[in-house]
Amino acid sequence: MTGQVTTVDGRVAGRRGQATRQKLLDCLGKMLGTSPYRDVRVIDVARKAGTSPATFYQYFPDVEAAVLELAEGAVRDSAALTELVAGRSWAGKAGRQTAEDLVEGFLTFWRKHDAILRVIDLGAAEGDRRFVRIRTRVQGAVVKPLAESIEGVRARGRGAEQGPSAAALAGSLVTMMAAVSSQPKSLQALGAKQAELKPSLALLVHLGVTGRKPAK
């Protein structure tokens, strides 16, 4: 947590106050992993954090405000995904490594933020523009640099010249990775082995970007 932290009434929180606020967020994050978002109450979060509802309300007006704060944390962490794509080579064995690194990084990011990402998807599906904007920012961390990579490959004559726009293709690839990341158990029930998901995603991402299978 960086920058100045203030309470709901505008006072600057001291070191202990910041620690309490962060503990409340951490406890909320854990609860979202085991309880439906709509069932989480202020009193439950406060109790888990070892404090009172009154203390919770010093830092957040309601549970939704705290959830949005957690969502912003996911947005900040998504910046690391951009680095897995921007400026990376998609040629030869380097291209294979780029695809594998992106898939590994994306799956790791999703596992870390799984609970809050599910809440973001729920809020976005219900039409809440705040969650729609947050989801767009998370996806954009990969879609934008991936679209630039596709355009670069096409400009060098290494990819398919015709076909969907780079943005549409990049968006489809990111949506595919997100869907696989969020549904591993159901895919396993359908016969997809966990160990095969990452290489399958890397293959499809590489094909989508370059139009070719990865180099062996």
Language model features: what each stretch is:
Residues 1-8, 214-216:
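Actinobacteria-biased recognition of intrinsically disordered, low-complexity terminal regions
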Residues 16-28, 45, 70-82, 146:
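Generic hydrophobic, amphipathic alpha-helix propensity
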Residues 23, 27, 31-65, 69:
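Helix-turn-helix
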Residues 27-31, 109, 145, 176:
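Short amphipathic alpha-helical elements of helix-turn-helix/winged-helix folds
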Residues 32, 66-74, 120, 124:
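Alpha-helical DNA-contacting segments of helix-turn-helix folds
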Residues 65, 69, 83-112, 166-173, ...:
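Hydrophobic alpha-helical connector segments
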Residues 76-82, 108-112, 119-122, 129-155, ...:
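Amphipathic alpha-helical packing segments from all-alpha helical-bundle domains
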Residues 118-121, 132, 153-202, 212-216:
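Hydrophobic/aromatic-rich alpha-helical bundle segments in the mid-to-C-terminal region
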